[in-house]
From Swiss-Prot:
Protein's recorded name: Glycine betaine reductase ATRR
Keywords assigned by UniProt, alphabetized: Multifunctional enzyme, Oxidoreductase, Phosphopantetheine, Phosphoprotein, Repeat
GO MF annotation: an example: oxidoreductase activity
GTP-binding listed as a keyword: no
């Protein structure tokens, strides 16, 4: 019995419903809604406009719109005008859209203004978001409207990929959907009040609710494959019915185990597009106990063929769920290769006849004839049946079961892909002579693999396919993006000499194709070293079972060792927390050995990863949305002012240098977040050990570092780093500045594999900052931008979200892009944030300490060993020394007054690698150029088999993933024009033969090279003593003792701030000291002016860090007779010697006491111990210095301050020539003939005092000429 009037067309059925329920809600999207009457009015107005363009029976109206209310209106209007709607996907690349328009020749295209530029040629266009205009000369006298019972006329055309390179348009008459809807209403009817969300199969769903009085809710494109957004929409819009693919449902269930509670109003869920596994069916039934789950099988050419209630038809005896009973059993046949019907239970090809068939493919008579063949089982003249290409069988229960594919069409995450179309475009647009595209993997792991035979002739239009060791080809993907939809582009590529053929048929034998490549990692055995290993699983077994980990073996069974239902639930929870994705109990129970659990965890991980990658644009959009509660109104805090700093990434390369520089240049307490899978307080010793091991390897460790460091065991991949809410809140209240340098770095892994740490971790960092008002200094990367060519990207460059999947081709860059977006959004919400984009971080410019995993280093070292280097046009070496990067970040973090948010720390003009190898030749490492392909072949034959390990570490790196030539050329250059003036005090080392000498000397020391480089300059030893990295302020530094002390401090590795009145002398001294590699700051300073002294200390603190050492050398000495009353000289003596020391102490001592450490050294005199005639006022001033220092020493005892008075005797300085009292000079200032002190003698005594251990105080140093004792 018909539920609807199957004699009327779709437009008439809609009009009937308008009359029946004019005020009922018919349609809504995220912007607007329409009652049936309002919708009818919109449809009528647009249909009249369409008629003016000549739309009539079988005319096509192109619909190039997002999934929205406008899309539905356009389709209904096309039908009311008497024509048919033509679906034009927004995802079509320009060439594919042009092919469809040329093939279908629509009378007009309905679109939005933003899409009109895509439509080429003379096709008329109607923009729904612009005011109506006339037909611009296209007005055609419309013919009569077709009668409403003409069900054979065209209703809609949808395109799928074709095998010859041209897409094919499937032409469906009104009869097909009308009869299909009637059958589906027999399975599950709709009624007023029902709310149907239309998303994945949009055009197949939008009209059905509108002929039964229900409401159509148009799901936006960006929600359709975004599980989180889709569930939110289904819940907030009170959806009662929807349809989705099994893959999408599986993804939703993995994230929302309580989906039934989230969607209490969802009464019906249709599944279509893929086979439903029994496992998924069972999970769905449990998760949605109050929802009717309907498994539906259909084809674009046939509409619905079978449908069944999953709860009634699922069986544990099969891996897959049957589809259900046939909806039209009279016209569905399962046939063998001879075209004969098979018996029940026997598999064959499913063919469908009857009145619901499509007309065929427009303008494709041959293709139509192959797919729609004469129906031998029908008595109707001219009847045809459609070959679905699916293998099926009828079960004894009367249910249809799909068992596989007969033809070549590939089902991929709900998409249908015809390999021939993909193969044709690969051959046409790449330098490929022959190609075969197949599917590899199952379920969510299913992906396209292209097997290619290379064409030796290539051009700009047909570039060579470069395939990296992991089987990916970013260049091929970029080239095909213009011609194929994203889901049609192969994920993996394999180059073969020839495609295997079948011995009998001569056709390509797909079964004989080799498997796709497995990624080769650094274990050197040719197998992928999976980051999840059996040791990880065993550690959690040991906790759950309370057994020693060392006793566990791969074949052990969880239940045999005492496991039970509660302990396996605990195990599931622990594994899920550790790895960041849900691991169901049932999966663990199915294969309960230790090795079985390892396989299970890996399989679920890979499925989780594939689900994310399948719908990357939607995932990116969701992940780049910041939680609403993350906002702040805190003021920015500099590192100089911070009392507590949180540092992440400290066990990495850059993080180690950041820790060392933070300790050396700030007074802050530093909390280091160290990663542990299951963070516990007991992990703190392990955290210390990991930091120590890292810093020792890089030559940075000294035991005093830990005096200022606290270990925080945590995990960035976990909510709140794995801390309790209270611990997280307490941490937030303590931290003033967060330096977030941690990241999971892997240029091979996809987005999903790096997402938790890089995106989730940054989100948690921002959450922490918002709760306590901390400032966030975020370390980003040049990888958030695509290759830049010769000119670099300026600081304000931001890649648009829609370009991320196609222009950032590695998961690392994609995750860092999303993380950066979160940081910038937090900044817009009031959080004080800074973003530091860094380039390729190379070794230390002075020590050469290198990142052992650096790819560029590996290529250089391996080239030296081969005697050949890759000669690649456009390959530039971006090397930014790590010490520069670290100090630049810290310096920029202290520039709180600037408004700039994004800083670039990289090489704005990287050198060509050819010049690098020329410089290496001067260092004694000659190499000759070789083409990239030949170099790779040579390396593979001569070095690829070499044993790895410490001595062959660079071999391991290249074995783990040889880069492609496109990767080498695709350098991302960062223009630092806006950053450079702000960080001008931090100079970037030049990449030249001197830097390369430092690097190669280090590589030799690590055993990577067989001989040291030829020395280019006299090497200065890198100071490693107790003064290395300390910050010292020296007054009176322009000459004499002050200059000697500054020189001695720089020689010890201390950074120095020089103050004196003669700036030219200071600059000259700075040039000399800077050559030793230390930082030097100069500031014109008169110590009698308190503001100038404060300015000197402020400059030292901002440029170098908190002051560790004060050496007050400024002083004057005049020989005067008391009776001669030389008032000007007396006043000058008191001002400089007395007020000067007070100003110096006032500017430095409070900061030292706050840090609990510091050393004050002041030049007194032996005249401060005994009065010398002719130097009465001078002696008095030095007695003042001694009294002041003694008081300071006594009052601060126990507070970490050391105070040293240095009492030089007669020293060769300019002071001896300052006096004007001739009588005093004659009487008391004549030389005795003894050898007096040099300034360096005094300086050395000061260095001796400064080098003493913290508990040793040298309170006074009396240093005199041997023959002039007091």
């Amino acid at each position: 019995m018909a539920i609807i009037d199957t004699t009327k067309d779709l437009s008439a059925l809609f009009t009937q419903q308008v009359r029946a329920s004019p005020n009922a809600l018919a349609l809504e999207d995220d912007k607007t809604s329409y009652t049936y009457a309002e919708l009818d009015k919109e449809v009528e107005e647009l249909s009249r406009r369409l008629r003016s363009y000549g739309v009539s029976r079988d005319s096509l109206v192109g619909v190039l719109l997002p999934r929205s209310a406008h899309f539905v209106i356009a389709c209904l209007a096309a039908l009311r005008a008497g024509g048919a709607f033509l679906v034009l996907e927004l995802a079509y690349p320009p060439d594919l859209l042009a092919d469809v328009l040329e093939d279908a020749t629509p009378a007009v295209v309905v679109t939005h203004r933003s899409e009109t530029g895509k439509i080429k040629g003379s096709v008329p266009v109607i923009s729904l978001d612009e005011p109506p205009v006339d037909a611009n000369g296209h007005t055609v006298e419309p013919g009569p409207l077709p009668v409403d019972d003409d069900l054979d006329r065209l209703a809609f055309v949808s395109y799928s990929s074709g095998t010859t390179g041209k897409p094919k348009g499937i032409a469906n008459p009104h009869r097909a959907p009308v009869l299909s809807y009637n059958l589906r209403f027999g399975v599950q009817d709709l009624q007023p009040g029902d709310r149907v969300a239309c998303n994945v199969f949009f055009i197949w769903e939008i009209l059905r609710p509108l002929i039964r009085g229900a409401t159509v809710v148009a799901v936006p494109d960006d929600h359709s494959y975004d599980p989180a957004a889709l569930v939110d929409l289904l819940a907030s819009r009170h959806i009662t019915e929807t349809l989705m693919t099994p893959t999408l449902l599986a993804t939703i269930l993995s994230r929302h185990s309580d989906i039934g509670a989230r969607l209490p109003e969802l009464r019906t869920l249709w599944l279509n597009g893929e086979v439903v596994t029994t496992d998924l069916a069972r999970r769905a039934i449990r998760a949605l106990p109050n929802t009717r789950l309907l498994n539906c099988y259909s084809a674009c050419e046939t509409h619905e063929i079978a449908c069944g209630d999953i709860k009634e038809i699922v069986s544990d005896e099969s891996q897959y769920c049957p589809v259900g009973p046939l909806l039209d059993p009279k016209h569905a046949y399962i046939v063998n290769e001879q075209g004969e019907k098979v018996e029940e239970g026997v598999s064959g090809e499913l063919c469908v006849g009857g009145p619901m068939l499509a007309r065929g493919y427009i303008n494709r008579p041959e293709t139509t004839a192959k797919a729609f063949i004469p129906d031998p089982f029908s008595n109707s003249p001219g009847a045809v049946m459609y070959r679905t290409g699916d293998r099926a069988r009828m079960l004894p229960s009367g249910l249809l079961e799909i068992t596989g594919r007969v033809g070549a069409m590939i089902k991929l995450r709900g998409y249908s892909v015809v390999p021939g179309k993909v193969e044709n475009d690969i051959v046409k647009h790449l330098a490929v002579r022959q190609c075969a595209v197949v599917a590899h993997g199952e379920g969510l792991e299913r992906q396209l693999v292209a097997y290619i035979v290379a064409d030796q002739e290539h051009s700009e239009e047909r570039p060579t396919v470069e395939i990296n060791s992991s089987g990916h080809s970013p260049g091929a993907r970029r080239a095909l993006t213009k011609f194929l939809a994203h889901y049609m582009i192969p994920a993996l590529w394999v180059q073969v000499d020839e495609l295997p053929t079948h011995e009998v048929s001569g056709k390509i034998d797909l079964k004989r194709l080799p498997p796709p490549p497995t990624e080769v990692l650094a274990n050197g055995n040719g197998k992928k070293e999976d980051p999840i290993g059996i040791e990880d699983i065993a550690a959690i077994w040991a906790v759950a079972l309370k057994v020693p980990k060392a006793t566990l073996k791969p074949e052990d069974n969880f239940f045999d060792l005492g496991g039970h239902s509660l302990s396996i639930a605990d195990l599931s929870s622990r594994l899920s927390r550790k790895f960041g994705f849900r691991i169901p109990i049932v999966r663990l129970a199915e294969n309960s050995t230790l090795s079985g659990h390892l396989d299970t965890v890996r399989a679920i991980r890979d499925g989780h990863t594939a689900a994310v990658q399948a719908d990357l644009p939607a995932v990116l959009r969701t992940d780049a949305t910041l939680d609403e509660e993350i906002r702040s109104d805190a003021k920015i805090c500099s590192l100089t002012d911070a009392k507590t700093v949180l540092l992440t990434g400290v066990t990495g390369f850059l993080g180690a240098f950041l820790l060392k520089d933070l300790v050396d240049s700030t007074s802050a307490h530093i909390i280091c977040l160290v990663r542990f899978n299951e963070p516990e307080d007991d992990d703190q010793p392990g955290g210390v050990a990991r930091i120590r091991r890292n810093l020792l390897d890089l030559g940075l460790w000294n035991d005093s570092i830990m005096e200022r460091v606290e270990i925080l065991p945590g995990n960035l991949s976990r909510s709140r780093f794995g801390l309790t809410p209270d611990a997280f809140q307490e941490l937030a209240q303590r931290v003033d500045v967060i330096v977030h340098a941690a990241a999971s770095v892997n240029l091979v892994y996809p987005y999903a594999a790096l997402r938790a740490a890089n995106v989730g971790g940054t989100r948690e960092i921002l959450r922490l900052a918002s709760q306590g008002g901390a400032t966030v200094q975020y370390v980003s990367t040049n990888g958030v931008l695509p290759p830049s060519g010769e000119k670099g990207w300026p600081e304000d460059t931001m890649l648009d979200m829609k370009d991320v999947p196609t222009k950032l081709l590695d998961g690392y860059g994609q995750t860092k892009w999303v993380a950066e977006q979160l940081v910038l959004e937090a900044g817009r919400r009031g959080l004080p944030v800074r973003v530091h984009r860094i380039g390729t971080v190379s070794g230390h410019s002075q020590s050469g300490a290198a990142n052992a995993w650096d790819l560029l280093t590996a290529l250089i070292v391996e080239s030296i060993k081969l005697g050949k280097y890759p000669d690649v046009e456009g390959w530039r070496a971006e090397m930014t020394p790590v010490d520069f990067v670290s100090k630049a970040i810290i310096h920029l973090a202290n520039q709180t007054a600037v408004e700039q948010t994004v800083f670039h720390i990289g090489d704005p003009d990287p050198v060509n690698t050819r010049s690098v190898f020329e410089d290496l030749k001067t260092l004694g490492y000659p190499t000759e150029p070789l083409s990239w392909d030949d170099w790779v072949a040579l390396w593979t034959s001569q070095r690829g088999h070499v044993k790895g390990g410490d001595g062959g570490f660079t071999v391991d790196i290249l074995r783990s993933g040889m880069p492609s030539i496109e990767f080498l050329r695709g350098i991302v250059v960062l223009d630092n024009s806006a950053t450079r003036p702000i960080r001008r005090e931090v100079e970037r080392p030049k990449v030249d033969r001197f830097l390369l000498e430092t690097y190669t000397r280090h590589w030799f020391a690590r055993g990577w090279l067989k001989r040291p480089p030829i020395r280019q300059r006299q090497l200065s030893p890198i100071p490693k003593g107790p003064l290395s990295g300390k910050v010292a302020v020296v007054t009176g530094a322009s000459s004499g003792i002050g200059a000697a002390v500054a020189t001695a401090l720089a020689r010890e590795g201390a950074h120095v701030a020089l103050g004196a009145r003669r700036l030219d002398a200071l600059e000259s001294l700075k040039e000399k000291l800077s050559a030793s590699g230390v930082k030097v700051v100069t500031c014109k300073t008169d110590v009698t002016d308190r503001k100038q002294v404060e300015g000197l200390v402020k400059a030292a603190t901002e440029e170098l860090g908190p002051v560790d050492i004060l050496v007050a050398c400024a002083g004057v000495m005049y020989f005067t007779m008391m009776a001669n009353t030389q008032m000007d000289e007396w006043e000058r003596t008191v001002d400089v010697n007395c007020k000067g020391i007070l100003n110096s102490l006032a500017s430095t001592v409070p900061g030292m006491l706050a840090r609990g450490k510091g050393h004050v050294v002041a030049i007194s005199s032996d005249a401060g111990r005994k009065v010398f005639p002719g130097l009465g006022v001078y002696s008095a001033s030095k007695f003042f210095v001694e009294a002041t220092l003694q008081a300071l020493r006594l009052e601060t005892a126990g507070q970490g301050l050391r105070v040293t008075a240095v009492q030089p005797g007669n020293t060769a300085t300019d002071l001896l020539g300052m006096s004007t009292d001739a009588e005093a000079i004659k009487k008391y200032g004549e030389p005795s003939g003894a050898q007096i002190l040099d300034p360096e003698d005094v300086a050395n005594s000061i260095i001796y005092a400064l080098r003493q251990p913290e508990h040793v105080a040298m309170n006074e140093i009396l240093i005199e000429p041997r023959d002039e004792p007091i």
